[in-house]
Swiss-Prot record:
Its main location: virion. Belongs to the rotavirus VP3 family. Keywords: GTP-binding, Host-virus interaction, Hydrolase, Inhibition of host innate immune response by virus, Methyltransferase, mRNA capping, mRNA processing, Multifunctional enzyme, Nucleotide-binding, Nucleotidyltransferase, RNA-binding, S-adenosyl-L-methionine, Transferase, Viral immunoevasion, Virion. It is found in: Virion. Residues 246-428 are annotated as: 2'-O-methyltransferase activity. Contains a bipartite N7-methyltransferase domain, a 2'-O-methyltransferase domain and a GTase/RTPase domain. The C-terminus contains a phosphodiesterase domain that degrades the 5'-triphosphorylated, 2'-5' linked adenylate oligomers produced by the host cell in response to IFN stimulation. InterPro entries: VP3_Rotav. Residues 693-835 are annotated as: 2'-5'-phosphodiesterase activity. This is Protein VP3.
Amino acid sequence: MKVLALRHSVAQVYADTQIYLHDDSKDEYENAFLISNLTTHNILYLNYSLKTLKILNKSGIAAVEVQSPDELFALIRCNFTYDYENNIIYLHDYSYYTNNEIRTDQHWITKTDIIDYLLPGWKLTYVGYNGKNTRGHYNFSFSCQNAATDDDIIIEYIYSNELDFQNFLLRKIKERMTTSLPIARLSNRVFRDKLFPSIVNIYKKVINVGPRNESMFTFLNFPTIKQFSNGAYIVKHTIKLKQEKWLGKRVSQFDIGQYKNMLNVVTTIYYYYNLYHSKPIIYMLGSAPSHWIHDIKQYSDFTFETWDPLDTPYSTIHHKELFFYKDVNKLKDNSILYIDIRTDRKNMDWKEWRKVVEQQTVNNLNIAYKYLSTGKAKVCCVKLTAMDLELPITAKLLHHPTTEVRSEFYAILDVWDIITIKRFIPKGVFYAFINNITTENVFIQPPFKLKASPTDYIVALYALSNDFNSRQDVINLINKQKQSLITVRMNNTFKDEPKVNFKNIYDWTFLPTDFELKDSIITSYDGCLGMFGLSISLSSKPTGNNHLFIINGNDKYYKLDQYANHMGISRRSHQIRFSESATSYSGYIFRDLSNNNFNLIGTNVENSVSGHVYNALIYYRYNYAFDLKRWIYLHSIGKVAIEGGRYYEHAPIELIYACRSAREFAILQDDLTVLRYADEIEGYINKVYSITYADDPNYFIGIKFNSIPYEYDVKVPHLTLGVLFISDNMIHNVVTVLKKMKTELFKTEISTSYTYMLSDNIYVANASGVLSTYFKLYNMFYRNHITFGQSRMFIPHITLSFSTKQTVRIESTRLKINSIYLRKIKGETVFDMSE
C-alpha cells in the first residue's frame, strides 16, 4: 500500500486506486487506521494531515506528500522505499527498460566488454550507489533516486553455470516483468544503511551474523562490528581433495577479473576488521587498472597506495613503477597488502611461461612473508598458482569467480600464519581446489555459536533459520538475548510444516508463540522498517519467503499505537468481505455463531468477539506487522499508552472468544498452522491474564425493567447481567463497582425483538445492546479481582417462562431499566439501585 497525499483532486483515473478524504470528525490516528484498511494499492489522500502521514510511515506504510502531477505519476507507477526521516524516496522502477537500457551501481562493470553481450541495441548505464546519480532526473519537492539496477542479474550470472549472457539476461528480464517485485530484497540495502549507523551509535559492541556479498559495501564503514559467517576454507581442508588437472573453463563471456580483485580485497578488509577493529591502509602491487576502487570509495573512505607501471586512476597514491622485495620496508603497520603481480605472457612458450609464473608465485610469497614478519596489525592477500608448494596449514584460500578457471587462486595470510606449521601441497590438489570450489562470500569469519551475549547487540538477518542450527538453540538465543534484531523464517504454511525448502537447504519455521519474550517486539519487515525511519509501498507476499523480525531491548516497546501497531489489521478481511464473501457481515456472523451466540441482530455493532485478535490470527500471513502478543501483554498489565484514535479496552474473555472463533475458522479452512497459533495464543492469554470463572456461581446481577412487551409467567422477568462467585465479605467490593458503573449501566440502550427457547423449558426474550456494557463491567470486576462471568459465552436474555412457548416476533422495542440489583442465587437481594 502507498498513500499519496494531495491538496487537490486529480482528473486522471488510475487503476487499483482509491480516494480518501480526511475526516475532520475523527482524529489523526483514526484517519490513519481507516486509510490503512482500504483495499486498493494506491490511496490518494485529500485534505491530508501531516500527523496522519507520520503515523502511517511509523507503521511502515509509505505515505508521501505530493506537490505536482509529475511527482504523482512517478510514485503511482512503481514501488519505493521511503526514508521519511530525511524525506528521500528510493524508487524500485524498472521502466528504464523502455529506453533499451540496463543499469548498474558498480562502476567496474562499465569498464568491461559487457556491452558486447547485451540485447541488440541496448546500453549499460552507471547510476551510482543506490542510484544516487539519478537524482538529477527528478526535480521534486522530496529527494528522489531510482535504486533499481540489474546488478542482481549480472552477479547471479557470474555465479551460475551458464555462459551465454545475452540469453541469461533476456530470461531474467522476462522473469522480472512477470513476477511480483521482491521488495524486501530491493529495499534491504536502504534498510541496512539506516539500521547499522543507528545501532553503532547506541551500542559499543555489535555482532552481525551471516552477512552475504550483498552486504559487502554496507559494513566498510563499521570496522568495530564483529562479523560471523560460515568460516574460511583453509589449507588443511585440502586434505580431503583428490588430485586433478588443469581445467581451463570459461566462467563469463565478459571480463570479470576486476570483480575478482575487488572481492579479494574486500574479503581481506573484513578479515582485518575482525582481527583489529579499525580501518587499514590498503597497499596493492600489480594494481592497474582497478576501476573497482571507485566503487569502494563510493561507500567508504580508504587510502589506496598502489604500484604498477600502468595507471591506476582511482588510487590515493600511485607509484608508476614495479615493486620489489627490497621495497617491503616502505609499507607501514595497520595495513593490508594485496599482491596481484603477474607478468604478461605475450608470445612466451607455455613451458617457459609456466616457469616464470611459478617463480613469480615464490617471489610473491616471499614479499608476503617479509611484510608479515615485522611490525603489527597486518594482513596479506597474495596471488598464487597451482604448483607444488608449502603453505601454512591455517592460510585462508580464496577462489572468487574470475573470467576463466585456470591455475590462479589466492591466499590470505596473517601474522600468526607465518609462524604456524606448513604443509606440502601437490599441484594436483590445488587444481582440485580451483576446479571445484568457488568462494561465494567475502565474509569468511567463523560461524556464530548460538549463545546469548549480555553486553553485545546481535543482528542476525536471514541467518539463523537454516536447519543446520538447532531450532531450540535459536529459540533460546532469542529468549535470552537482551539486545538484538534477529529474523526467523515465518511459518506461513497451511499444514504447520516445521521446516520448508529454500533453494538447496531447509529452513526451520516459527510462529510468534514459539518465543517467551518481554520488552520485545515481533513484527514483519514493514513493521521493522517503521521503527528505523523507513516505510515501504509494497508488503511481502503472504505466502512468500517471509520472516519474523524480533527486536529485543528498544525504547519503542510501550509505544503500542506507534510501532508494530494495528494499522491494516482488517485490510485482508475487507478484501474478502467486500468481494467474494456471502455478505460483508460474514466475519461478524461467523464470530458470533462459532461461539454459540445466535442473536445476530446488530452483530456488526455489537459483536461478542475481539475482531482485532480474530483478524490477527486468521489472517496473520497478511498482517503480522501487528505484534499480537505484545498487544495482549500490555493490556494484561494495564500499560497501554495510546496517543489517539478510538480506543476500546477488550475484556480478556473477548480475546478468548476470538481464539475459539479462529480455531473453528482454521478447521473449516484445513489450516493447521492457524489452528495451532490460535490454541497457543489462547494459552498465552490465560498465562498473562488471571482469568477465573464463576461456573458454579452464588450471586448474580439482575436488571429489572419497567415493562416487558411479552407475556410471561415468572414472578419478575429480568436480565441477568452476569453471575459471580464471591464470598460474603466481597459484597461491598461488588457494590462499589456497581455504583461506579451506575451512570453507564442506566444509559445502556437495551432492546428486544423476539422470543425463543434457550433450552428445554426455558423460554426467553433476546436482549440487544448489552454486550459492550457487560464487557466494561467484566473489566472492572477483573481489575478488582472479583470472579465474574462463566467460561461459556455470555448470551444476554430475559427469562419469561419455565415452560415451552412459541416464538414471538415484534418490532424492536427499547426497554426502560427500572432497577439494577445484586442477589444471592436462591437467596435474598443484597443490593438494589434505581436511576
